[in-house]
Amino acid sequence: MRTAITQLVVVLSLMLASCAGYAPHDQLIGQDRVTLVAAMGQPERETTTGNFKKLHFVRSPSGWDTYFVYLDENDRVLRWEQVLTEDSFNSIQPGMTKDQVVQILGATKITNGLARNRGSVWHYRYENPQCESFLIEFTPEDTIRSTEYRIRSGRRCKYVGIG
């Protein structure tokens, strides 16, 4: 009996630890980079803007969020934000480049090519009551041709490939 309880405690602890690593939390503010990476895992990308570094933590295709964590010149966490929001999506405009999109939304792991080499589509899933996704269509020159919100079919919010 005692072994079963011990095993249950270990399993529940591991489950809690895996949930804690999905998103940043305010206790990370002021912590160093080593502590951040221990809590969140390795960032997908790192960019430098002005006096701070921006670390991208992309949680797709399984997750619905992308977090940017900002570090100061001493590699300490200044702040964090979840960037897959309608305000961010609405700032994406035709003519922008893929790199500009990544600076605003982070990279996506859900991409599809268009027939006859007409470009590609990036697909961002995000948390919302309508089960919408945000799609960005790029030209072969890697600039935005169009964007759209798409409601996923079916009763559950789950990934449906772009056809």
Residue spans for each PLM region:
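Bacterial N-terminal signal peptides that target proteins for export
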Residues: 1-9
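Generic anion/oxyanion-binding catalytic loop in active/binding sites
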Residues: 8, 25, 90
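N-terminal amphipathic/basic helix or basic patch
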Residues: 9-10, 31
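A structural connector/turn signal
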Residues: 22-23, 87
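A cross-family detector of function-defining hotspots
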Residues: 23, 28-76, 94-163
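Short domain-boundary/entry signatures in modular proteins, especially
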Residues: 80-91
